[in-house]
Amino acid sequence: QFFHAPSWAVVALATVAVIVSTPVLAKGFSRRGKGVFYESNFLIQRAPQLVSLLNIAAIFVSTFTFNKHMNPPLATPVFTLTTGDPRALIAVSWLGVAIMVSGLVFMIGGWYSLGEAFSTDAELLDGQKVKDTGLLKFVMHPAYSGIIQSLVGASVAALSPISLGLSLFVVAPLWLNRAKYEEELLIKTFGDNYKDYAKKLKWRRLVPSFFPIGV
């Protein structure tokens, strides 16, 4: 077989995600850089996106390595783990698929929940208001949470230590930093209205408040 079943599931999920998210991403891209408050800061605007794309490339290599179609230098254990009980490895891979499903729901649902306030850059758009509908009822930055979850899930599905490390220790901090920057803009603009919203969610930026721990 060309791919293990979990890898085919990742491909299918990614394909569906591209199709479903294209309309909202196109609108968000068209609004980029048009905000009433916008800071052209590489660490805020571009670094999270570029590192996420780099991680996707690493996941791609790891997936092909996991399925024995590539053999890059240091393939094991850097790009994928291939030693151990095959059934256990596949079970872990399926766990990654489940995490990826959750991530895609949060990511795409977060973009749609923002509606006309969604831009692919961190900025405050003209006429923007504090929103608490859709997935914004559960977490302050559902799309960023979803991006991180999706990359973690795809990394686990590929049994990729390098991709998982990038997701947790590089991608996640960059998106969290961007989330905090956006909060500063929203607090400056909306004051107590936004603070009240954040307090209602226990200031949970990435992990819904119904989980006992989180950020």
Pin down the residues of each PLM region.
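Membrane-anchoring alpha-helices and their flanking helix-loop junctions
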Residues: 1-132, 151-215
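Membrane-interface loop-to-helix entry segments
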Residues: 94-95, 132-148
